[in-house]
Swiss-Prot record:
Required for the formation of a threonylcarbamoyl group on adenosine at position 37 (t(6)A37) in tRNAs that read codons beginning with adenine. Is involved in the transfer of the threonylcarbamoyl moiety of threonylcarbamoyl-AMP (TC-AMP) to the N6 group of A37, together with TsaE and TsaB. TsaD likely plays a direct catalytic role in this reaction. InterPro entries: ATPase_NBD (IPR043129), Gcp-like_dom (IPR000905), KAE1/TsaD (IPR017861), Peptidase_M22_CS (IPR017860), TsaD (IPR022450). Pfam families: TsaD. GO terms for biological process: tRNA threonylcarbamoyladenosine modification. It comes from Borreliella afzelii (strain PKo) (Borrelia afzelii). Keywords: Acyltransferase, Cytoplasm, Iron, Metal-binding, Transferase, tRNA processing. Belongs to the KAE1 / TsaD family. Its EC number is 2.3.1.234. The lineage of its organism: Bacteria, Pseudomonadati, Spirochaetota, Spirochaetia, Spirochaetales. Fe cation binds at H110, H114, D298. One of its GO terms (molecular function) is N(6)-L-threonylcarbamoyladenine synthase activity. Transmembrane segments: none annotated. This is tRNA N6-adenosine threonylcarbamoyltransferase. It is found in: Cytoplasm. One of its GO terms (cellular component) is cytoplasm.
């Protein structure tokens, strides 16, 4: 079965063709450079650019896969969570294709797509612990299957990637913040500043994260940095921030591994491409799986791959389904019961 995967939850316009849930025939992504001067994604610009680009990106994906649109068996599309305007563009495009081609459509949760991505590269047996790190999400989950996910902990404020972007903006390091901070940190001293690392002691927040304190502490160094008599460089600030940002992850992650007794770890999301983070994780001495770089960031392949499996198990989504920018109380919503409705159709 050939699945066309469409992902437009933020600022990347992504379309892919995947066969039988794992064989990637094409994986095309168009990143929107227009946001760089704003040091962040502008929702109105993102949705407009998706509208302009999605048809050409789809054509490129089909051409790369050597596949005619009539040969597509299923259309998978991200319907939640994300920027509502961007989601609507992708969802309406997918609906139009489904109706005109008389093909089934399956709507996919962006978070579950990221958690599925590593499975397209490595054969990983369930159960395992997943750590999702992206610009919009930071969470730890216990996975027993592609659709059996229990979120153990999540950020209570900023995501890890969002904190990188905001610090980079204040220090004029560039957007996106993650790769730019990683790059200049290589020439910095990570011990110049001791930024705060948040650890929760309450049972209900045992596996949770917080990045607002770290972000604020780093930004408060800005005035000292501007002082001409201060020898501190951007490299040192970036390196010190990066060190604290990833130390912030380690304690909750260790707790999850210890408490669940699960000895396999899967890292997903755009921040997973950070090599400094991978060095930190490798020190945990646990079997760890990373997706290739093109599956770390937003992509259509993960949506198509998960869509194949969701469709086989649950069937198609109703054509009336609407995009949803948020998932209220999502930590609890991902706890499934037997025969419960598909996440994507919730």
């Amino acid at each position: 079965m050939k699945v066309l995967g469409i992902e437009t939850s933020c600022d990347d316009c992504c379309v892919a063709v995947v066969e039988n849930g794992i064989h990637i025939l094409s994986n095309i992504k168009l990143s929107q450079k227009e946001h760089e001067k704003y040091y962040g994604v502008v929702p109105e610009i993102a949705s407009r650019l998706h509208t302009e680009a999605i048809m050409s990106v789809c054509i490129k994906a089909l051409k790369k896969a050597n596949t005619k649109i009539s040969e597509i068996d299923l259309i998978a599309v991200t319907s939640r969570p994300g920027l509502i305007g961007s989601l609507i563009v992708g969802l309406n495009f997918a609906k139009g294709l489904a109706i005109s081609l008389k093909k089934p459509i399956i709507c996919i949760d962006h978070i579950l797509g990221h958690l599925y991505a590593p499975l397209m590269h490595s054969k990983i047996e369930y159960p395992f612990i997943s750590l999702l790190l992206s610009g919009g999400h930071t969470l730890i989950a216990k996975q027993k299957n592609f659709d059996d996910v229990e979120i153990l902990g999540r950020t209570l404020d900023d995501s890890c990637g969002e904190a990188f972007d905001k610090v980079a903006k204040h220090y004029d390091i560039g957007f996106p913040g993650g790769p730019n901070i990683e790059q200049i940190s290589k020439n910095g001293d990570e011990n110049t500043f001791k930024f705060p690392v948040t650890t929760f002691r309450k049972k209900e927040n045992w596996y949770d994260f917080s990045y607002s304190g770290l972000k604020t502490a780093c930004i408060h160094q800005l005035e000292k940095f501007k002082n001409k008599d201060n020898p501190t460089t951007k490299n040192n600030i970036a390196a010190s921030f990066q060190k604290a940002a990833f130390e912030n992850l380690i304690t909750p992650l260790k707790r999850a591994i210890k408490d669940t007794q699960i000895k396999k770890l899967v890292i997903a999301g755009g921040v997973a491409s950070n090599l400094y983070l991978r060095e930190k994780i490798d020190k945990l001495k646990i079997q760890t799986y990373y997706p290739p770089l093109d599956l770390c960031t937003d992509n259509g392949a993960m949506i198509a791959g998960l869509g194949f499996n969701m469709y086989l198990k649950y069937g198609e989504s109703p054509i009336e389904i609407e995009a949803n920018s948020r998932i209220e109380n999502y930590k609890n919503q991902y706890k499934r019961k037997n025969n419960e409705k598909n996440f994507s159709n919730a």
